[in-house]
Curated annotation (Swiss-Prot):
Cofactor(s) in the UniProt record: Mg(2+); Zn(2+)
Enzymatic reactions: 1-(5-phospho-beta-D-ribosyl)-5'-AMP + H2O = 1-(5-phospho-beta-D-ribosyl)-5-[(5-phospho-beta-D-ribosylamino)methylideneamino]imidazole-4-carboxamide
Pathway field: Amino-acid biosynthesis; L-histidine biosynthesis; L-histidine from 5-phospho-alpha-D-ribose 1-diphosphate: step 3/9
Documented EC number(s): 3.5.4.19
Name of the molecule in the record: Phosphoribosyl-AMP cyclohydrolase
Record's cofactor remark: Binds 1 Mg(2+) ion per subunit.
NCBIfam families listed in its UniProt record: PRK00051.1
Designated gene of the protein: hisI
GO MF: magnesium ion binding; phosphoribosyl-AMP cyclohydrolase activity; zinc ion binding
Amino acid sequence: MSGSKSSSETEEGLAFQPSFDASGLVTCVATDAKTGDVLMVAHMNEEALRRTVETGDAWYYSRSRKALWRKGESSGQVQRVLEMRTDCDQDAVWIKVEQQGAACHTGRRSCFYRAVAKGEGAGIRLAFVDAERLFDPAEVYRAKA
C-alpha cells in the first residue's frame, strides 16, 4: 500500500498509496452511510487499512494500547464499511459505515455528542446534544474484561 509517489500521482492517480505519518498512521473519519453524521475519528495503520478493505469491517489502531482492534470486538457495536475514500494527498481516509448500535465507547451513537458554545462573557462551554446512551459502558466493558 505504501511507496514513493509524485504529487500528481497522489492527487490524480488511481493507485491507493496512503501517506502514513511518522507514527505509521492515517486519520480515519467514520460517518453514518445513511445520515452522513460523523460518528468518530480514529487512526489506522497499514494493517488496519488492509483488514478493513479485506473484511468490510472497520479496523483501527489504538495509539494508547498500541494494538489493532476491530470496531465492536468488545462492545458488539460493529461498523460495516460500505465505502472508503481517501483525501487528495492520501493522508486521511473517510469511511461510510452501517453502524450497529453506538460508535462511541461512552455508549453514545456518535463520539461528537457535545456542542462547543459561547458561554458567559468570553467563556466557552460544552452543551450535550444527541447524548443518549445506547449502552452502559461500565456493564459492556466490565463483562468483556
